[in-house]
Swiss-Prot record:
Its EC number is 5.3.3.2. It is found in: Cytoplasm. Its cofactor is FMN; NADPH; Mg(2+). The gene is fni. One of its GO terms (molecular function) is NADPH binding. GO terms for cellular component: cytoplasm. Involved in the biosynthesis of isoprenoids. Catalyzes the 1,3-allylic rearrangement of the homoallylic substrate isopentenyl (IPP) to its allylic isomer, dimethylallyl diphosphate (DMAPP). This is Isopentenyl-diphosphate delta-isomerase. It catalyses: isopentenyl diphosphate = dimethylallyl diphosphate. The lineage of its organism: Bacteria, Bacillati, Bacillota, Bacilli, Bacillales. One of its GO terms (biological process) is isoprenoid biosynthetic process. It comes from Bacillus velezensis (strain DSM 23117 / BGSC 10A6 / LMG 26770 / FZB42). It is an enzyme of class 5 (isomerase). Its main location: cytoplasm.
Length: 349
């Protein structure tokens, strides 16, 4: 099977498997504010993500590319909607275009349709610094995502089996790429120990990529003769991942992703420490079911609903929302307690 064929299979399986809604965000409850003293029109949702200023904390996370005409059309529609909504956009892994130049157009269309927007390039941790620079140049990217997908590769029948040297490559890429480097998980979450290593290696931001959204173990298991079912429930939830990473330092740039489906999910993620929130499966489903205009409507509704939530909490800015008090309960509270993370610092601030 070619890379392009595998990319198309991934899209179809992602739509059919959906999201399992085990992000841990249902364990998060905001402390209600009866006197917010704020008008909705005064709310400012601009933010800084890894040193980049964005008018929107929500962005379209990496989905696809390199799968022929289908992925070209998806990326074209995503780029158009992102331009109209003022949202950043990440492309899927560009390794396929580095190996097969005929696939470059499925990525280059993003910059062509969105010449002034924030665009993130994307490669896996197997890439070297020279490939990273080529990926950035391909789409004149403002930042580069490096994705960590060990479990997906292990389950993938034709996937990688050696993961040595990844941190060293990331460190070199961060030093030489010429743009901020964001390192992201792909649905299996991230511990504070892993995040610390990545920040120390020069990552401008880490993306939690928590468990609870699109499940790449399930997707790859659908392609196996003998499924590795034990990996289907493997990982750290989005909520727990965010709290873990935030426990390192309040000054680090954190991105939330992994099953985010609503403005409330985004608001909770920001209050857990994120400065930006990536959504992929939700936007892909909107595009395939409602078309490009329907996707744009969904995006603008999310941004407006986020402003409403911030108004209710009395938070005029994203930085204020990051300090909004919340209570953590259930499995997420249990996980964090066992990991030695004091949840009262969220509820008593």
């Amino acid at each position: 099977m070619t890379r392009a064929e595998r990319k198309r299979e991934h899209i179809n399986h992602a739509l059919s498997t959906g999201q399992n809604r085990e992000t841990g965000l249902d364990d998060i409850t905001f402390v209600h504010v009866s006197l917010p003293n704020l008008a909705l029109e005064k709310v400012d949702i601009s933010t800084k993500i890894g040193g980049l200023t964005s008018s929107s904390p929500i962005f379209i996370n990496a989905m696809t590319g390199g799968g022929g005409q289908l992925t070209y059309e998806i990326n074209r529609s995503l780029a158009r909607a992102a331009r109209k909504a003022g949202m950043p956009l990440a492309v899927g892994s560009q390794m396929s275009a580095l190996k097969d130049p005929s696939e470059r157009c499925s990525y280059e269309i993003v910059r062509k349709e969105n010449p002034d927007g924030l665009i993130f390039a994307n490669l896996g941790s197997e890439a070297d610094a020279e490939q990273a620079k080529m990926a950035v140049d391909m789409i004149q990217a403002d930042a580069l995502q490096i994705h960590l997908n060990v479990i997906q590769e292990i389950v993938m029948p034709e996937g990688d089996r050696s993961f040595t040297g990844a941190l060293g490559r990331i460190e070199r890429i961060a030093a030489e790429a010429g743009v901020p480097v964001f390192v992201k998980e792909v649905g299996f979450g991230m511990s504070r120990e892993s995040a610390r290593q990545l920040f120390d290696a020069g990552a401008a931001a880490v993306d939690a990529g928590g468990y609870g959204g699109t499940n790449f173990s399930k997707i790859e298991n659908m392609r196996r003769e003998k499924a590795l079912q034990f990996f289907n429930t493997w990982g750290i939830s989005t909520a727990a991942s965010l709290a873990e990473i935030h426990s390192l330092s309040a000054d680090q740039s954190i991105i939330a992703s992994g099953g985010l489906q609503s403005a409330l999910d985004v608001a909770k993620s920001i209050a857990l420490g994120a400065s930006g929130a990536g959504m992929a499966g939700t936007f892909l489903k909107a595009l395939t079911s409602k078309g490009e205009e329907g996707l744009f409507d969904e995006m603008t509704a999310l941004l407006q609903e986020l402003k409403m939530i911030m108004t209710a909490l009395g938070c005029q800015s994203v930085s204020q929302l990051q300090k909004a008090p919340l209570v953590i309960k259930g499995d997420t509270h249990h996980w964090l307690s066992e990991r030695g993370i004091d949840t009262s610092r969220f509820s008593r601030r």
